[in-house]
Amino acid sequence: EDLSFKYEHPEAYQQIEEKLKATQAERTNLFEEFTAPIREQLDKMGLPYRILARIKSPYSIWNKMQNKHITFEEIYDILAVRIIFTPKNEEEELNDCFNIYVAISRIYKPHPDRLRDWVSHPKANGYQALHVTLMSNKGQWIEVQIRSERMNDVAEQGFAAHWKYKEGGGSEDEGELSKWLKTIK
């Protein structure tokens, strides 16, 4: 989509790229400030985790601007936060997702209409995650996606990645599958 957008609408693509670059430092600061108290809570929970910033693609930004008739500055979800954790065990994966949700909702006020539970009710393609939108201390809504490592692998590599968890993981074939999937991405 981004590649097509770049060549179909080069001026719009360039304008969005320039605005993304111009606001990058602001987004980085917001990410660091927003995630610092989340990291403290997750450390207390004792689950291994990583937190990533997800930046909306130029095409997705443009598409939202077109569909909602809004400006670049009016798009609140250019930055999203992704929490990827390793559950205590397979049986606790769902509970761990919701425990993380509860912990971060104590730090930041959740948007009452923006909780998406694809953990209890996965999408047809196998996608699972909790998406919640939280109000930062700077008054910005920020989407947070909560996923286990398994859920992240399925989201990034497709449902075929799910088999390694069913088989116990760690096989030589798993590495070959990952290499192959990266070549076709």
Give the residues covered by each predicted segment.
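Nucleic-acid processing machinery
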Residues: 1-185
